[in-house]
Amino acid sequence: MKTKIKELYVFEGLGKERIKTPVEAGEICAVLMDLDKNVAFEIGDTICDIDNPEALPPIKVDEPTMSMLFTINNSPFFGKEGKYVTSRHLRDRLFAELEKNLAMRIEETGSPDSLLVYGRGIMHLSVLIETMRREGYELQVGQPKVIIREIDGQKCEPIEQLTVLVPEEFSSKVIDVVTRRKGEVGTIDTKGDRVQLDFTIPSRGIIGLRNTLLTATNGEAIIAHRFLEFQPWKGDMDDHKYGALIAKETGEATAYSISKLQDRGPFFIEPGDHVYAGEVIGESLRPGNDIVINVVTAKNLTNMRTKSADEKSTCSPAIKMSLEEAMEYIREDEYLEITPQHLRIRKIILDEIERKRARIAAGYKDE
């Protein structure tokens, strides 16, 4: 196809600038050309000299390795903050994203309110979600799941190349954390006062790994990973060690209630936060067990007490998660509710009795 470049732009800061001089090799630029309306560029196409039409090797876009369920927000706090809250808004926005997000895929779920979105990992999907959040969307997402393929009759999963750079004294901790997630040590190189550790690890082992490593290394770890290939399934990994603290009633959390329940585990909420029944408001210290608690009870007043006495209740600081941390934290029976102003973790089934019935029907013992 013959055409002529009319304008040439280079990127400067957050914008772009038109230039009339040639660009150097390696520079990123944008071009404006006259094109037939029936002709479109594809990823990997080459713009070259008409007298020397030699195309570069085509660029291969990596396939998705992870999926998440995107659905409308149907929590009791639905529609209080967002501008775009309906299934039509959600579907239109996600399908519009397909036009520019080349590594993303969308699959119908059979429900008009939900879509299965495939991406290149937690960070890839979190960028999309954060963008939608800032645009005024309300939505919920499910637990991220890696894509499983059957190759030559064998169950296979995506494997990533993981590189961790840490001070030497933390190297043993890093190896312990990664190998517990089915990671395998590759090479160990010393670079000054730091050690570079290379691993191969299943993509599902990457979920939640960054925060664990930063905690284990006092924030010193530098972490990078990329997709390597599909390999045979590495076996099951340990799930969440602890259960969840679940709100029993809808209302405003009080310092009095939270202070009395500090021994149950750390909280994700603070006094004055509004919660609803079925919301995950903390982490239970009872391994594997969820605990339903009431955090909206206020101190009963008598003629010997005043309302200001409630303010003397002491509470430990709440755990505040980023979007990526919350996406990595949620379990199979939970959703992450995302609004322009809040992130909330909730049980998919909000009603306590219905939740217990579902567990029994699924073969779990009652809590």
List each model region and its residues.
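C-terminal structured "cap/appendage" subdomains that terminate the fold
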Residues: 280, 284-287, 294-344, 349
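A short, contiguous, amphipathic alpha-helix enriched in charged residues
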Residues: 77-98, 315-318
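Helix N-cap motif at beta-to-alpha junctions
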Residues: 35-38, 119-125, 167-171, 200-207
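Interdomain boundary/hinge elements
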Residues: 2-26, 55-73, 88, 101-114, ...
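Short, surface-exposed ligand-recognition loops at beta-strand->loop->(often short) alpha-helix junctions
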Residues: 73-86, 162-170
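Conserved nucleotide-binding/hydrolysis modules and their immediate coupling elements
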Residues: 1-68, 78-80, 242, 251-302, ...
